[in-house]
Protein backbone atom coordinates (compact mmCIF):
# COMPACT_ATOMS: atom_id res chain seq x y z
CA UNK A 1 0.00 0.00 0.00
CA UNK A 2 1.30 3.44 -0.96
CA UNK A 3 0.81 6.45 1.30
CA UNK A 4 1.23 10.09 0.34
CA UNK A 5 1.82 12.20 3.46
CA UNK A 6 1.52 15.97 3.23
CA UNK A 7 3.53 18.11 5.60
CA UNK A 8 2.91 21.83 5.48
CA UNK A 9 6.33 23.03 4.37
CA UNK A 10 6.24 25.58 1.57
CA UNK A 11 7.95 23.32 -0.97
CA UNK A 12 4.64 21.53 -1.53
CA UNK A 13 3.06 24.69 -2.97
CA UNK A 14 4.12 23.35 -6.38
CA UNK A 15 1.96 20.27 -5.80
CA UNK A 16 -1.80 20.22 -6.33
CA UNK A 17 -3.13 18.67 -3.12
CA UNK A 18 -6.66 18.62 -4.53
CA UNK A 19 -5.72 15.91 -7.03
CA UNK A 20 -6.72 12.38 -6.13
CA UNK A 21 -4.54 9.41 -6.95
CA UNK A 22 -6.25 6.05 -6.74
CA UNK A 23 -3.05 4.18 -5.94
CA UNK A 24 -2.28 6.34 -2.86
CA UNK A 25 -3.83 6.72 0.59
CA UNK A 26 -3.43 10.40 1.48
CA UNK A 27 -2.54 11.84 4.87
CA UNK A 28 -2.53 15.52 5.77
CA UNK A 29 -1.96 17.75 8.77
CA UNK A 30 -3.84 20.52 10.50
CA UNK A 31 -5.07 23.32 8.22
CA UNK A 32 -4.79 21.34 4.99
CA UNK A 33 -8.49 20.64 5.58
CA UNK A 34 -9.11 24.22 4.40
CA UNK A 35 -7.82 23.36 0.94
CA UNK A 36 -8.72 19.76 0.26
CA UNK A 37 -10.00 16.45 1.57
CA UNK A 38 -7.46 13.81 2.52
CA UNK A 39 -8.13 10.21 3.46
CA UNK A 40 -6.69 10.83 6.93
CA UNK A 41 -6.31 14.18 8.70
CA UNK A 42 -3.93 14.39 11.68
CA UNK A 43 -4.35 17.28 14.12
CA UNK A 44 -2.27 17.77 17.26
CA UNK A 45 -3.00 21.32 18.49
CA UNK A 46 -6.31 21.77 20.29
CA UNK A 47 -7.14 25.13 18.69
CA UNK A 48 -6.85 23.53 15.26
CA UNK A 49 -8.85 20.51 16.41
CA UNK A 50 -11.67 22.82 17.38
CA UNK A 51 -11.47 24.58 14.00
CA UNK A 52 -11.68 21.26 12.16
CA UNK A 53 -14.56 20.05 14.31
CA UNK A 54 -16.57 23.26 13.91
CA UNK A 55 -16.10 23.15 10.14
CA UNK A 56 -17.92 19.77 10.17
CA UNK A 57 -15.04 18.26 8.19
CA UNK A 58 -14.74 15.60 10.89
CA UNK A 59 -18.25 14.32 10.24
CA UNK A 60 -17.51 13.33 6.65
CA UNK A 61 -13.81 12.51 6.77
CA UNK A 62 -11.54 10.39 8.94
CA UNK A 63 -9.55 12.40 11.49
CA UNK A 64 -6.89 11.53 14.05
CA UNK A 65 -6.76 13.93 17.02
CA UNK A 66 -4.19 13.97 19.82
CA UNK A 67 -5.41 13.80 23.44
CA UNK A 68 -9.04 13.60 22.32
CA UNK A 69 -10.44 12.56 25.69
CA UNK A 70 -14.23 12.57 25.55
CA UNK A 71 -16.02 13.63 28.74
CA UNK A 72 -19.57 12.37 29.19
CA UNK A 73 -21.94 14.46 31.30
CA UNK A 74 -19.13 16.81 32.34
CA UNK A 75 -19.83 20.41 33.35
CA UNK A 76 -16.76 22.56 32.52
CA UNK A 77 -18.09 25.78 34.05
CA UNK A 78 -15.76 25.69 37.06
CA UNK A 79 -12.75 25.54 34.76
CA UNK A 80 -13.60 28.93 33.28
CA UNK A 81 -12.69 30.65 36.54
CA UNK A 82 -8.99 30.56 35.65
CA UNK A 83 -9.42 32.18 32.23
CA UNK A 84 -10.48 35.60 31.03
CA UNK A 85 -13.52 35.69 28.77
CA UNK A 86 -11.42 36.44 25.67
CA UNK A 87 -9.42 33.28 26.32
CA UNK A 88 -12.40 30.93 26.52
CA UNK A 89 -13.27 29.23 23.25
CA UNK A 90 -16.45 27.17 23.51
CA UNK A 91 -18.50 25.74 20.69
CA UNK A 92 -22.31 25.68 20.88
CA UNK A 93 -23.60 22.92 23.12
CA UNK A 94 -25.37 20.08 21.36
CA UNK A 95 -28.09 17.68 22.45
CA UNK A 96 -25.35 15.11 22.96
CA UNK A 97 -23.93 15.76 26.43
CA UNK A 98 -20.30 15.02 25.58
CA UNK A 99 -17.36 17.35 25.18
CA UNK A 100 -13.58 17.57 24.96
CA UNK A 101 -11.83 20.13 27.18
CA UNK A 102 -8.25 21.23 26.50
CA UNK A 103 -6.02 24.23 26.91
CA UNK A 104 -3.25 25.99 28.77
CA UNK A 105 -3.14 29.10 30.92
CA UNK A 106 -0.64 31.95 31.13
CA UNK A 107 1.26 30.20 33.92
CA UNK A 108 1.85 27.16 31.68
CA UNK A 109 3.04 29.40 28.86
CA UNK A 110 5.37 31.37 31.12
CA UNK A 111 6.81 28.17 32.58
CA UNK A 112 7.56 26.86 29.08
CA UNK A 113 9.13 30.16 28.12
CA UNK A 114 11.40 30.21 31.19
CA UNK A 115 12.47 26.60 30.67
CA UNK A 116 13.39 27.06 27.02
CA UNK A 117 15.00 30.45 27.56
CA UNK A 118 17.21 29.07 30.32
CA UNK A 119 18.27 26.18 28.11
CA UNK A 120 18.83 28.32 25.00
CA UNK A 121 19.62 31.85 26.25
CA UNK A 122 20.60 33.05 22.79
CA UNK A 123 17.12 32.66 21.30
CA UNK A 124 15.13 35.70 20.21
CA UNK A 125 13.10 36.46 23.35
CA UNK A 126 10.17 38.11 21.56
CA UNK A 127 9.85 35.30 19.05
CA UNK A 128 10.12 32.64 21.76
CA UNK A 129 7.44 34.33 23.85
CA UNK A 130 5.04 34.43 20.91
CA UNK A 131 5.62 30.72 20.32
CA UNK A 132 5.09 29.80 23.98
CA UNK A 133 1.93 31.87 24.35
CA UNK A 134 0.35 30.57 21.14
CA UNK A 135 -3.12 29.09 21.75
CA UNK A 136 -3.29 30.14 25.41
CA UNK A 137 -6.87 29.59 26.49
CA UNK A 138 -9.56 27.11 27.44
CA UNK A 139 -11.00 25.15 24.52
CA UNK A 140 -14.35 23.44 25.10
CA UNK A 141 -15.61 21.49 22.11
CA UNK A 142 -19.12 20.06 22.37
CA UNK A 143 -19.49 16.93 20.29
CA UNK A 144 -22.07 15.71 17.87
CA UNK A 145 -22.95 12.12 17.12
CA UNK A 146 -21.32 10.11 14.36
CA UNK A 147 -18.15 12.11 13.91
CA UNK A 148 -15.15 10.30 12.44
CA UNK A 149 -12.53 11.35 14.97
CA UNK A 150 -10.14 8.77 16.40
CA UNK A 151 -7.92 9.47 19.39
CA UNK A 152 -4.22 8.95 18.68
CA UNK A 153 -2.90 6.21 20.93
CA UNK A 154 0.71 6.38 19.70
CA UNK A 155 2.90 8.28 19.07
CA UNK A 156 2.34 10.98 21.68
CA UNK A 157 3.82 14.48 21.88
CA UNK A 158 5.12 14.38 18.33
CA UNK A 159 4.61 16.89 15.54
CA UNK A 160 1.60 16.42 13.28
CA UNK A 161 3.74 15.50 10.27
CA UNK A 162 5.79 12.79 11.92
CA UNK A 163 2.68 11.48 13.66
CA UNK A 164 0.97 11.16 10.28
CA UNK A 165 3.90 9.21 8.85
CA UNK A 166 3.96 6.85 11.83
CA UNK A 167 0.20 6.27 11.61
CA UNK A 168 0.47 5.55 7.88
CA UNK A 169 3.07 2.89 8.66
CA UNK A 170 0.93 1.47 11.46
CA UNK A 171 -1.90 1.05 8.97
CA UNK A 172 0.24 -1.02 6.64
CA UNK A 173 1.88 1.32 4.16
CA UNK A 174 4.92 -0.27 2.55
CA UNK A 175 5.77 2.82 0.49
CA UNK A 176 5.54 6.32 1.98
CA UNK A 177 5.97 9.51 -0.04
CA UNK A 178 6.69 12.57 2.13
CA UNK A 179 5.77 15.97 0.67
CA UNK A 180 6.26 19.32 2.39
CA UNK A 181 8.66 18.00 5.01
CA UNK A 182 11.08 20.90 4.67
CA UNK A 183 12.22 20.83 8.29
CA UNK A 184 13.08 24.26 9.69
CA UNK A 185 15.83 26.60 10.78
CA UNK A 186 15.61 28.77 13.88
CA UNK A 187 17.77 31.42 12.20
CA UNK A 188 15.52 31.75 9.16
CA UNK A 189 11.87 32.77 8.64
CA UNK A 190 9.27 30.17 9.51
CA UNK A 191 8.54 27.72 6.71
CA UNK A 192 4.83 26.89 6.68
CA UNK A 193 2.12 27.14 4.05
CA UNK A 194 -0.36 28.49 6.62
CA UNK A 195 1.79 30.97 8.54
CA UNK A 196 -0.04 34.17 9.38
CA UNK A 197 -3.46 32.50 9.40
CA UNK A 198 -5.71 31.48 12.29
CA UNK A 199 -3.99 29.23 14.87
CA UNK A 200 -0.59 29.63 13.23
CA UNK A 201 2.40 31.79 14.03
CA UNK A 202 2.77 35.23 12.39
CA UNK A 203 4.42 35.64 9.01
CA UNK A 204 7.48 37.26 10.57
CA UNK A 205 8.14 34.44 13.05
CA UNK A 206 11.38 32.55 12.98
CA UNK A 207 11.60 28.83 12.33
CA UNK A 208 12.23 26.04 14.82
CA UNK A 209 15.23 23.98 15.74
CA UNK A 210 14.43 20.76 13.80
CA UNK A 211 16.31 18.40 16.12
CA UNK A 212 13.13 16.84 17.54
CA UNK A 213 11.55 16.41 14.12
CA UNK A 214 14.69 14.74 12.80
CA UNK A 215 14.81 12.44 15.83
CA UNK A 216 11.16 11.45 15.31
CA UNK A 217 11.75 10.77 11.62
CA UNK A 218 14.79 8.61 12.33
CA UNK A 219 12.75 6.67 14.90
CA UNK A 220 10.18 5.95 12.18
CA UNK A 221 12.79 5.00 9.57
CA UNK A 222 14.40 2.56 12.01
CA UNK A 223 11.19 1.08 13.41
CA UNK A 224 9.69 0.51 9.96
CA UNK A 225 12.93 -0.54 8.30
CA UNK A 226 11.10 -2.61 5.68
CA UNK A 227 9.11 0.40 4.45
CA UNK A 228 10.43 2.41 1.50
CA UNK A 229 10.35 6.13 2.32
CA UNK A 230 10.60 8.66 -0.50
CA UNK A 231 11.30 12.21 0.65
CA UNK A 232 10.00 14.57 -2.03
CA UNK A 233 12.17 17.69 -2.05
CA UNK A 234 13.19 20.79 -3.95
CA UNK A 235 16.62 21.41 -5.43
CA UNK A 236 18.25 23.00 -2.38
CA UNK A 237 17.20 20.41 0.21
CA UNK A 238 20.02 19.01 2.34
CA UNK A 239 19.31 15.62 3.90
CA UNK A 240 19.66 15.57 7.69
CA UNK A 241 19.90 11.79 7.90
CA UNK A 242 21.11 8.71 6.08
CA UNK A 243 19.05 5.54 6.15
CA UNK A 244 19.07 2.78 3.55
CA UNK A 245 15.27 2.81 3.31
CA UNK A 246 15.06 6.57 2.66
CA UNK A 247 15.22 7.83 -0.91
CA UNK A 248 14.82 11.28 -2.44
CA UNK A 249 12.79 12.55 -5.36
CA UNK A 250 11.96 15.92 -6.91
CA UNK A 251 8.33 17.02 -7.19
CA UNK A 252 8.45 16.97 -10.98
CA UNK A 253 9.56 13.33 -10.91
CA UNK A 254 6.77 12.37 -8.52
CA UNK A 255 4.31 14.04 -10.86
CA UNK A 256 5.60 11.88 -13.71
CA UNK A 257 5.31 8.77 -11.53
CA UNK A 258 1.71 9.59 -10.68
CA UNK A 259 0.84 9.98 -14.36
CA UNK A 260 1.81 6.37 -15.09
Locate each region found by the language model:
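Metal-ion/cofactor- or nucleotide/acyl-coenzyme-handling active-site neighborhoods
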Residues: 1-260
Amino acid sequence: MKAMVYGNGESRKVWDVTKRYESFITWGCNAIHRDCVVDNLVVIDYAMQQEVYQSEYAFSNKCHFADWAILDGFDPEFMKENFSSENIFETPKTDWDKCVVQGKDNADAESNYARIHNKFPGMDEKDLRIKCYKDVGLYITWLGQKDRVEDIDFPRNWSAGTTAIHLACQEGADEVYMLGFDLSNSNKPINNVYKGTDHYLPNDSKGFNPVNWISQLETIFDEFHEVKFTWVVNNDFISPTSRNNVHYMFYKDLDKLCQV
